[in-house]
Amino acid sequence: MLMITSFANPRVAQAFVDYMATQGVILTIQQHNQSDVWLADESQAERVRAELARFLENPADPRYLAASWLAGHTGSGLHYRRYPFFAALRERAGPVTWVMMIACVVVFIAMQILGDQEVMLWLAWPFDPTLKFEFWRYFTHALMHFSLMHILFNLLWWWYLGGAVEKRLGSGKLIVITLISALLSGYMQQKFSGPWFGGLSGVVYALMGYVWLRGERDPQSGIYLQRGLIIFALIWIVAGWFDLFGMSMANGAHIAGLAVGLAMAFVDSLNARKRK
């Protein structure tokens, strides 16, 4: 048994313990003068301490309260700060995250005004050999979305995952992941369905894979994704592949994006271990 930390407020201690339980780490609380948090499996100590540092930065983060709800441990002893909606958006998103979101919204509005086809003529993957040197096309397909649900779903994930990467690892890392995954997921998708596709989902899947594996292999990176969410991503890929919902999905982009994210996370976490 290893004591991780002590909290003066028992509800704060319980919130942290509940959250770590959702991550597969079992902690116990022993009440003395304060609430002492103990870890049974000492091999998980590094991961727990990394998460503790994040928790202490912002114990009011909604994910901690959500974990307490799942565990049935909510009460009035712990008071969470409340943030206005846009303040919460600003807190998590860096400049690259915002620029991408704004660009997608502007393109979406243009598609509603001018029509999908007109915008795709300018932004779609090169659909004619004469366009192969219009290099922006290899990336701008990610800006196009064909329904309100499509853009909302992708931008929510982009904000959640991309914002975390940018805040923890820097704008440069997010740009690199975005450009590589947009290029390779677009290439794969055009092999599947031709050049007439669009959406940020290939990049989103890359971020899912990157954040999950980097968090698993390098907890001190400060980024992480719950295993349940990566399982959801895999189920969604399978559902799209077998057309279970009767929806048109960019299956090639999803698979390629996820593979890119996992590969980049593996390399980055390997380099991080070598630097230690």
Swiss-Prot record:
PANTHER family: RHOMBOID PROTEASE GLPG (PTHR43066:SF26), RHOMBOID-RELATED PROTEIN (PTHR43066). InterPro entries: GlpG_N_sf (IPR038236), Peptidase_S54_GlpG_N (IPR022732), Peptidase_S54_rhomboid_dom (IPR022764), Rhomboid-like_sf (IPR035952), Rhomboid_protease_GlpG (IPR023662). It catalyses: Cleaves type-1 transmembrane domains using a catalytic dyad composed of serine and histidine that are contributed by different transmembrane domains. SUPFAM superfamilies: Rhomboid-like. This is Rhomboid protease GlpG. It comes from Shigella flexneri. It is an enzyme of class 3 (hydrolase). The gene is glpG. It is a multi-pass membrane protein. The active site is at residues 201, 254. The keyword Membrane applies. Signal peptide: none annotated.
